[in-house]
Amino acid sequence: MYSIKTDHKLMPRERLIRLGPEKLSNQEQLAILLRTGNKEKHVLELSAYLLSSLDSLADLKKFSLQELQRLSGIGKVKAIEIKAMLELADRIQIAGQAVADPVLSSAQVAEKMMIELGDKQQEHLVAIYLDSQNKIIEEKTIFIGTVRKSIAEPREILYYACKNMATSLIVVHNHPSGLTKPSANDYHFTEKIKRSCDYLGLICLDHIIVSKYDYYSFREKSDLF
């Protein structure tokens, strides 16, 4: 659990101006984002309460909008603001990790995508489009799955490949269960997308399954490539 302190004489905004954002605690940073408290709790107490509900700061990402709203003092508006802040932070991190150099291995792509998709609670299918120098042209989320729906047709993957005039592509999806062992459907889909790419003169470099801590590369571990 976090150790929460509320003895600062200056309010978080004043401390940020005077000392810089890197000097503020997680509690103070969150208090700035929350902006105000409520009738029962000062904003610093509210941020302390929220952080005390976590084992680690990373757990904040796991709260759904509804779960945040169920916390005392966190209404709908504050819950929306927190979720938006977390999503923006993810996008900033992803943008900062954009691969400018050529993609040289499946492991390189897997490491990047484990960060991006490892915490997702639904299955995400992402296509990474590359030019003739193996540099990334675009990374596109093609599909977000539900319990009743699974990855089906490669049509949309190929549409964006043609739109980007890509030379090759890599398909990545996550297993929310944390287990990266491919299913029979994963094998079938890999064969299907590879055949479709061959038909259009595209190179399917790999299909990678990721979790938070592991990955499976069809190129590295199967005989499909």
Swiss-Prot record:
Taxonomic superkingdom: Bacteria
Gene Ontology terms: biological process: proteolysis
A molecular-function term among this protein's GO annotations: metal ion binding
Keywords for the protein's UniProt record, in alphabetical order: Hydrolase, Metal-binding, Metalloprotease, Protease, Zinc
Location of the MPN domain: 102-224
PROSITE patterns reported for this sequence: MPN, UPF0758
Residue positions binding Zn(2+): H173, H175, D186
TM ranges: none
InterPro entries: MPN (IPR037518), RadC_JAB (IPR025657), RuvA_2-like (IPR010994), UPF0758 (IPR001405), UPF0758_CS (IPR020891), UPF0758_N (IPR046778)
SUPFAM superfamilies recorded: RuvA domain 2-like
Pfam families: RadC, UPF0758_N
Coiled-coil portions: none
Motif (JAMM motif): 173-186
Family: Belongs to the UPF0758 family.
Protein name, UniProt field: UPF0758 protein SEQ_1136
